[in-house]
Amino acid sequence: MKLQLCLVLLLLGVLYVQSVPEKRNKPECNSYRGQCTYMGHPCPDHTFPCETYFDCPAGPHERCCCYKD
């Protein structure tokens, strides 16, 4: 039982460590001439959805649409 608890805590620790630096290193959408649109709405012309690459400062229910240069 103790071993299982140790393994679970270790796994949670590893997942936490992996998730923190990734979030910190992502630039905000605005710094890439991006704009936020509500999830489910298409991105405007000349933009592409980039929710997997950029953090959207507007909140968790939104995604980024970044301009194509």
Curated annotation (Swiss-Prot):
Q: Which GO terms describe its cellular component?
A: extracellular region; nematocyst
Molecular function per GO? toxin activity
Record propeptide residues: 20-22
Got any disulfides in this one, which pairs? none
Question: What does the UniProt entry say about where the protein is found?
Answer: Secreted; Nematocyst
Query: How is this chain modified after translation?
Result: Contains 4 disulfide bonds.
The alphabetical list of record keywords is: Disulfide bond, Nematocyst, Neurotoxin, Secreted, Signal, Toxin
Tell me where the signal peptide lies: 1-19
Membership in a protein family: Belongs to the Cnidaria small cysteine-rich protein (SCRiP) family. delta subfamily.
Q: What else is known?
A: This protein indicates that the SCRiP family is also present in Actiniaria (sea anemones) and not only in Scleractinia (stony corals). This family has firstly been claimed to be implied in calcification, however, as this family is also present in sea anemones and that they are not calcified, this function seems improbable.
Role this protein plays: Induces neurotoxic symptoms on zebrafish. Has also been claimed to be implied in calcification, but this function seems improbable.
Name of this chain's protein: Small cysteine-rich protein
